[in-house]
């Protein structure tokens, strides 16, 4: 049992009756039925699953990685990378120029990344409109949905002063005339310990 004063959402969910099947422990095929099956439990999958379940649909989420609880986090990067990230945090872009820290655990990248939260940028929405026929995906049409999720996920301005490297980045951006501000984060009870 954890001695942390911060509640463990995984343990709370299991206590409420979450049905979890660890595929790594199965020794026979199983048949499951649902109205909707969602592949991936990251930001998009998790929010979609909750929205659909609240509307009365039965939902199954299929996740490649394991379910980890607060008690499973030992604050050791050597253990975290192989157990929580795709390709042990070695995934890269095709040209190998950029590392991609993509989660491979329940919660996906929302479990392992820094909780930065921002609305889909207008140029991205415009790209989706032009290339995927999503004409209704405008900032105005999505604003109430963004607001609903921001409230649900406790998204707010990060009030902790930036560390020196981020402050230097902010000052440099200001000198170049580039707008810069503290990023919005989805946190509740964060102690800013660096983990």
Residue spans of the language-model regions?
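N-terminal glycine-rich phosphate/pyrophosphate-binding loop and immediately adjacent elements
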Residues: 5-128, 133-134, 139-140
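Conserved redox-cofactor binding core of oxidoreductases
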Residues: 2-15, 114, 135-195
